[in-house]
Amino acid sequence: MATDELASKLSRRLQMEDEGGEATEQPGLNGAAAAAAEAPDETAQALGSADDELSAKLLRRADLNQGIGEPQSPSRRVFNPYTEFKEFSRKQIKDMEKMFKQYDAGKDGFIDLMELKLMMEKLGAPQTHLGLKSMIQEVDEDFDSKLSFREFLLIFRKAAAGELQEDSGLHVLARLSEIDVSTEGVKGAKNFFEAKVQAINVSSRFEEEIKAEQEERKKQAEEVKQRKAAFKELQSTFK
């Protein structure tokens, strides 16, 4: 290595003398002189690279503000649910993933408005169109109007932290799911059990109302049948 370096320096000095250059390198200063000569180029190159990167970011931001291009989606970033959602056990996250895949009818990794509508209907808590949109907007970090798995997990994080309004659709979803997201030991388990009992009571009342409507329709049909029979009997008396 030392021999090659020395040969290179001697070759450079001979070349400079042949060209009539007067800048003779002094022993011991060769490295410093070379560094000084190359430093401006490297600095300019670094500054140019930084300027290009900044310009690209500013142009992208301007495009996004004008509605051109797509913003980088947090939900599409590769993430590890077990490290990002440490408040949940592996079993809890597996249960959430199973539920998410169950209602991801399109198998595209998202739950869209219609799939969320079907989910809430199957859970026994149908929502209005505006209600469904509001549910998505509450955790829709990338504003794509659908739920990624990460955003789906955010629902249960907010539920466990008590950050959801009790009358909100997301609170109902978390409450009616079969996933226990309690993180407060016995107290959390007690609250979860009470919430499940309340959900069962709501479901029972809903079933009772349906049964009452069915009984009312049967009663009305029977009355119509009896009136028709009485009318026919009355007709027969005049024959």
From Swiss-Prot:
**InterPro entries referenced in this protein's UniProt entry, alphabetically:** AIF-1_EF_pair, EF-hand-dom_pair, EF_hand_dom, EFHD1/2
Major location category of this protein: membrane
Key words, A-Z: Acetylation, Calcium, Membrane, Metal-binding, Phosphoprotein, Repeat
Tell me where in this chain the PTM Phosphoserine is found: S11, S73, S75
Query: Which residues does the UniProt record annotate as the domain EF-hand?
Result: 91-126, 127-162
Q: Where is the composition biased (Low complexity)?
A: 32-46
Task: Spell out which residues are annotated as carrying Phosphotyrosine.
Answer: Y82
Report the superkingdom from the record: Eukaryota
Q: Where in the cell is it found?
A: Membrane raft
- What segment(s) does the record annotate as region Disordered? 1-51
GO cellular component entries: membrane raft
Q: Which GO terms describe its molecular function?
A: calcium ion binding
Kindly provide the name given to this protein in its UniProt entry: EF-hand domain-containing protein D2
Q: Report which gene this protein is encoded by.
A: Efhd2
